[in-house]
């Protein structure tokens, strides 16, 4: 590889001016190349907040993207089933497994990794192990999906972000999906009508952040059994007693001990904020102090 014939400073300057997508492609070329990128581009790699695998119901084959701290996402790779009518594949050894690749040029160059039908899990695991080694522990690894028919691979250091629509929900399958999923980071329920509460033992209540959007319902069903840190509720109506009971139980210190933040919005009219604040005995934050802030993964 002629690149290594250049002086080190020239190599470093070249890598400094390469986009993340191209750095990622080069990281597969050889162990030596990957080590050089990690050495010279350490600060850029640490600037990445999330690496995300997205696999939805319409396209069950994931693509991989990253989100740096400037929030400008870059797609790095697609992972697809191998097509027999293509002949321009090349092979690379990824974490001990030989994987077929192509460079797609339909709209812009994109690295595509391929798997045969019986080895999708092993290909994804090998690519994830490569990503762990290349990007390191400073990056948060997320698996985003709205397809609860397919169980998420058990990957190291992976957290799950799930979107659930209420169209003909299969509650048994959904409960099984949650129970088999890796660490639950974020769940968004979008329900046009009434949603049955899950079992009090459901793993869905253990997600770090839950968002419930119910434009035509008055049933924010997650509050009573929630064990996570943050709840975001968007409903057409609330029972004030449900909210005040939740907050008072939270304040008691006996319940919801990991909980940090509750956000509520009512679609029809504003919430009776003063009434709720009076019932729960809320105190105002001093204007001179900075209130705490909370973030969730961008879906």
Functional labels for PLM-detected ranges:
Residues 1-299:
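Non-core capping and flanking segments associated with repeat-based/extracellular domains
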């Amino acid at each position: 590889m002629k690149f290594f014939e250049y002086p080190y400073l020239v190599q470093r300057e070249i890598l400094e001016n390469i986009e993340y997508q191209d750095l990622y492609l080069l990281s597969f070329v050889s162990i030596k190349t990957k080590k050089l990128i990690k050495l010279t581009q350490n600060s850029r790699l640490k600037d990445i907040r999330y690496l995300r695998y997205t696999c939805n119901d319409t396209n069950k084959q994931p693509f991989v993207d990253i989100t740096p701290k400037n929030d400008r996402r870059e797609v790095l790779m697609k992972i697809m089933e191998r097509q027999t009518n293509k002949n321009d594949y090349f092979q690379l050894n990824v974490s001990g497994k030989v994987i077929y690749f192509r460079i797609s040029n339909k709209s812009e160059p994109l690295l595509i990794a391929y798997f045969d039908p019986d080895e999708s899990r092993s290909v994804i695991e090998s690519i994830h192990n490569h990503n762990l080694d290349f990007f390191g522990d400073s990056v948060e690894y997320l698996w985003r999906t709205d397809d609860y028919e397919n169980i998420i691979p058990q990957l190291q250091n992976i957290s799950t972000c799930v979107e659930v629509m209420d169209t003909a929900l299969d509650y048994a399958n959904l409960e099984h999906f949650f129970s088999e999923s890796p660490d639950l980071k974020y769940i968004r329920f979008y329900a046009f009508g009434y949603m049955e509460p899950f079992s009090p033992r459901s793993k869905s209540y253990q997600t770090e952040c839950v968002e419930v959007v119910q434009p035509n319902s008055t049933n924010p069903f997650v509050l009573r059994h929630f064990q996570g840190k943050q709840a975001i509720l968007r409903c057409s109506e609330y029972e004030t007693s449900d909210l005040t009971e939740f907050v008072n139980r939270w304040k008691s210190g006996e319940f919801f001990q990991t909980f940090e933040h509750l956000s509520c919005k009512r679609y029809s009219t504003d919430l009776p904020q003063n009434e709720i604040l009076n019932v729960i005995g809320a105190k105002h934050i001093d204007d001179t102090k900075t209130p705490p802030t909370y973030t969730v993964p961008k879906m």
